[in-house]
């Protein structure tokens, strides 16, 4: 295996040099490791992020394989463990702090030392709670809302709602029994979130 310096030089040589210098010591919190969280984490690691805190209580199920960044072999594993494996297959030198816990207002403080939080929950009430935590603590948070169905990808956007809150998605199409989730729209939303995180880290606050 290549040593760290050589590997990072090769792996990141196509990235903007300004980006690499600004993000190399930054830490991102990933709240949820499902369809949004797993894809956000992959995009960030491929973009040069080297420090992550990832939290989720769930295990990989067969029904996750249609949109989450896991493979057949991961079914039955805790998502935080499976995602760590996936990310270290991209960059073996990244630093990952993982928490196999159900996130709520009693433990959001695991993200207190993060520069930005990526919100990747399923339920609206949980999204609201962590957004309130982040804004109260003057911490940037990028949330995902509205990515279900096979609607046009062009209605997925990122919006700035206040100094610390950004929301990616179409803001209306949530998953139901009739309105399922496609890998394409979930990944587009997740990559909107990842891209906004990278912009904020470079002090580019406009969407």
Predicted regions and their residues:
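Hydrophobic residues within alpha-helices
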Residues: 40-41, 83
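Conserved S-adenosyl-L-methionine
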Residues: 46-51
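Glycine-rich phosphate/adenylate-binding loop
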Residues: 2, 27, 109-116, 120-207
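Glycine-rich phosphate-binding loop and adjoining beta1-alpha1-beta2 segment
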Residues: 54-90
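A structured beta-alpha segment of the ubiquitous adenosine-cofactor-binding alpha/beta core
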Residues: 80-86, 90-114, 121-124
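Hydrophobic/small residue at the entry helix of a nucleotide-binding pocket
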Residues: 36
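Hydrophobic Val/Ile/Leu positions in short beta-strands of Rossmann-like dinucleotide-binding domains
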Residues: 30-33, 54
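N-terminal charged helix/coil linker that caps or initiates catalytic domains
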Residues: 1-28
């Amino acid at each position: 295996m290549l040593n760290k310096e050589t590997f990072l030089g090769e792996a990141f040589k196509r990235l903007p040099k300004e980006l690499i210098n600004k993000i190399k010591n930054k830490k991102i919190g990933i709240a949820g490791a499902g369809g949004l969280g797993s894809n956000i984490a992959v995009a960030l690691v491929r973009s040069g992020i080297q420090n992550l805190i990832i939290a989720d209580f769930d295990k990989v199920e067969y029904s996750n394989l249609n949109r989450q960044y896991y493979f057949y072999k991961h079914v039955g594993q805790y998502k935080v463990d499976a995602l760590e494996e996936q990310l270290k297959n991209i960059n073996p030198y990244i630093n990952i702090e993982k928490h196999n816990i159900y996130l709520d207002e009693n433990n959001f403080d695991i993200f207190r030392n993060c520069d930005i939080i990526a919100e990747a929950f399923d339920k609206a009430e949980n999204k609201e709670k962590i957004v309130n935590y982040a804004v109260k603590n003057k911490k940037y948070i990028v949330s995902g809302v509205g990515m279900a169905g096979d609607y046009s990808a062009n209605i997925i956007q990122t919006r700035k709602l206040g100094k610390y809150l950004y929301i990616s998605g179409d803001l209306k199409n949530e998953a139901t029994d009739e309105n399922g989730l496609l890998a394409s729209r979930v990944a587009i939303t997740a990559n909107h979130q990842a891209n906004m995180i990278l912009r904020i880290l470079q002090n580019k606050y406009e969407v």
